[in-house]
A protein has these predicted regions:
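N-terminal active-site segment of His-dependent metallophosphoesterases
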Residues: 1-47, 418-419
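Active-site glycine-centered loops adjacent to acidic/histidine catalytic or metal-binding residues
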Residues: 2, 37-38, 71-72, 170, ...
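Aromatic sugar-binding surface patches on proteins
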Residues: 327-376
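Short beta-strand elements
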Residues: 394-420
């Protein structure tokens, strides 16, 4: 996802594709892939849509069929000061600007069945579609046009209520209030255990809406726009594998694509709570105590069970840190920012991208939120810590490695093209 130039597409071909094929080779069931949008990185007057054909070539070398959802950066954008020329065949801005995607990847709204699961892939980037209006790449929200909603109604009318419905979109619907979002949710809730697969955010998160609908927001294989091999929330650049049996997901796990993070057991990272992270462009000082630990469980949510052992003896359960995004103005180069203990973010990952790579030194796009951070206060400050994390499917993962030096970043998280 998010390929803008040849360096980006080369990394997809060198890292993501082989990583996918290595994992596919381990499977005993037929595999299918869904790309959740932002395959390219078009914005404003910058068009990256020509790279779609290059990425399609890389997709063709992945050993499974890949279905594609359109993202907000997959439009053909024009200069924001130029009018959009429409035609009878493409009478709105939306239609004009989605043609490049359709020409390479096919329809933007479609569905298919696999067993007793009905997959629906839809575009849910909503722009004001006034012909001849001025185009602004940022003037969108998560939503569906009336025509798209009616298409979904007709599609689901043909689907038995006994089937599981998986709606695949780009922008998360659990955090969107755009046109027809609530209607789409109600449609999905008329089926048992519907699920939404989405992307867009560059972080991993699960959102439960009662017992009839939940959303899995997937991290990006490009991480922080290919500047490293980790996401802004600390997850590896990676993807999630879901195993379906009849109408249930019987197992699922997140996995990275790069060596050092491409094994199933790599599901978390532990930090000392008082780390100083970053580099010469910005430093970040955590405010937790010396005997406190932060535990980032990459795919963790409220249904995970986290346990801590000290010197091999069960010591208790850590406390989930309520989601809280701390933002700041970067200030002068090399400045140290004190991070409040209420922040749930992964400042080891943020520190690398901002402080070492000098990315996101203005704005907050690199100050990524985190929804899966826990805190543990050691009973014995000298004890050896082990964390055990059990997912909702009964899989148990353990970690004993603790990051104690926040300024020493391992090579396996670094981009091969931007070694700092």
């Amino acid at each position: 996802r998010h390929t803008q130039n040849s360096a980006d597409t080369d990394r997809y071909g060198a890292e993501t594709g082989p990583g996918l094929n290595a994992e596919i080779a381990k499977q005993t069931l037929p595999c299918y892939g869904i790309s959740l949008g932002d395959i390219t990185y078009s914005e404003g007057s910058r068009n990256s849509t020509p790279s779609m054909e290059i990425i399609r070539g890389h997709f063709s070398r992945v050993n499974m069929p890949i279905f594609n959802v359109m993202g907000n950066h997959d439009y053909t954008y024009y200069n924001t000061n130029a009018s959009i020329d429409t035609s009878p065949e493409s009478s709105t801005i939306n239609l004009v600007s989605q043609r490049s995607f359709e020409n390479v990847f096919g329809p933007i709204n479609f569905s298919f069945d696999r067993g007793n699961v009905h997959f629906v892939c839809m575009k849910n980037i909503y722009f004001e579609s006034t012909p001849q209006s001025k185009w602004n790449a940022g003037d969108y929200e998560g939503g569906f046009t009336d025509a798209e909603y009616q298409w979904l109604v007709q599609d689901l009318e043909k689907t038995p209520k006994t089937m599981k419905v998986v709606l695949c979109v780009h922008i998360p619907i659990s955090t969107s209030n755009g046109p027809n979002i609530s209607k789409v949710k109600n449609l999905l809730k008329s089926f048992t255990n519907s699920i939404v697969f989405s992307g867009h955010t560059h972080y991993q998160r699960t959102v439960y809406e009662g017992n009839r609908l939940y959303e899995q927001i997937h991290a990006a294989v490009c991480g922080q726009w290919w500047w490293s091999r980790i996401e802004g929330d600390g997850c590896p650049n990676g993807y999630t594998i879901h195993y379906f049996k009849d109408t249930d997901i019987k197992d699922a796990y997140f996995i990275g694509v790069n060596e050092g993070m491409n094994i199933r057991d790599y599901q978390m990272r532990i930090y000392k709570g008082n780390l100083r992270t970053g580099g010469k462009y910005a430093y970040f000082q955590q405010s937790h105590g010396e005997n406190e630990y932060l535990i980032n469980v990459f795919n963790g949510d409220e249904k995970w069970k986290i346990k801590v052992y000290e010197n091999g003896v069960y010591a208790g359960q850590p406390t989930w840190i309520p989601t809280n995004k701390y933002t700041f103005n970067t200030g002068s180069s090399g400045q140290t920012h004190t991070i409040p203990s209420s922040s749930s973010q992964d400042w080891w990952a943020i520190g690398y991208h901002i402080g070492v790579c000098k990315r996101g030194t203005s704005g907050s796009s690199y100050q990524t939120n985190n929804y899966h951070m826990w805190k543990w206060t050691a009973i014995d400050p000298t004890a050896k810590i082990k964390v055990e994390a059990e997912d909702p499917y009964g899989n148990v993962y353990t970690c004993e490695d603790v990051v104690t030096d926040g300024l020493n970043y391992p090579d396996y998280i670094k981009s091969p093209l931007t070694i700092f």
